[in-house]
Amino acid sequence: CIRDSLKNHLYEYFNDRGYKHKLRQEIDEECLDYLDKLNEIAYQDDYITSYVQGIFSKLNATTIDSNRGESLNIRIIQSSEPDAFMLPNGSMVISTGLLCTLDSEDELAAVIACELGHFVLDHQVNNIYRAERRAKRAAFWADVFATTASAALDVAYWDDNEDAYAVSLVADIGAIASLLSIPATDRLGMKYKTSQEISSDRLARQLLAFKGYNPDGIASALGKIIGYYNLHQRNKDIPRYGSIGNLQKRIEKAGESHSLSARPYLRTTSDVVSFNASMNYANKRYKETARLIRKNIDNRLATDNDYIILVKAEMALSNTEEVNNRCLAMLDKAQEMAGTSPNLDIYKQKILLLMRMNKQAQAADILKEYITLLSAYEGQGIEGTEKEWTNKEIGWANQMLDRISRI
């Protein structure tokens, strides 16, 4: 039985090395500080958090050791990167980018199980302890959020890794880059040796099978994570994973499998895909925006707002007759989907598109409809920022009508 086998292993491990309660307490304080910083990029969606928490709770294998007092929990953060890591205090961090990259619950469960395996096997605390032997505690924790590799590590301990991680800022969005940088996660014990990755994956396969998930989700998930980084032409300096080479080694050990996909998962995470598309658009990453929205469209899960975001991205990337006509068709599709609940954003985007296409007369007609809808919205007694926005849009629309009349 996996439970008894693991329990015996951990008994021998902790009997030999001890629980290091004081070190764990200090690590917990550092983790809480790090999590406090991650709150800046927290993803707020109770439904998605509950969904991921449900998978995590089902896989939870830490009750096998009553001496482990950590409180296990899930945090979901905003990030384009397919990140997942478990802090040594029991906090599991999952990125919206990972939820968008995967296509099935089996894959998500696999990633969670692999990270949970590191925690159960105490890899993070062991790594921190090994590193701390060579550095005074004050210096060791002084620059957790720095972007230079200043921590002294026990070189012999890492001999089974081909390369040390090269440290650099990743091409990410705003504060996310520094919060999820390689030094920040490595200093919290998450720079795993190859042997640790393999042993955690092995435990994960057993745990997944025991809990009714497909163990092939490991290889499928890792393959899609590789696909993400290949698409973005990055093969090293990858937070948490180090390099594509490291991921490929894990796939070789886990065993090749076919790509998994499940519609219930795709349906559950479609709003996350829309969110990440909007985040990428706000940061002017238009190709990534379009790629994500097309995932929802291909899965027949797109909303009217998805089509609007895609039109905005397409218009930012290109200005040809073919693209403009395609964008116009997508806006018509969005309007059809909106039905009897007018989406003001559709009207605004259609006006901009028609002006680009030199169809001023049609744009003028849409402008008049837009003003009518805005006035009706204003008449509902809105206040504050909504009223300011409405007045601003009415003013803009009237200016555009005046401009068209002078063309």
Where are these regions (language model features)?
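His/Cys-centered metal/cofactor-coordination and adjacent catalytic loops
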Residues: 180
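Hydrophobic alpha-helical transmembrane segments
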Residues: 161-177
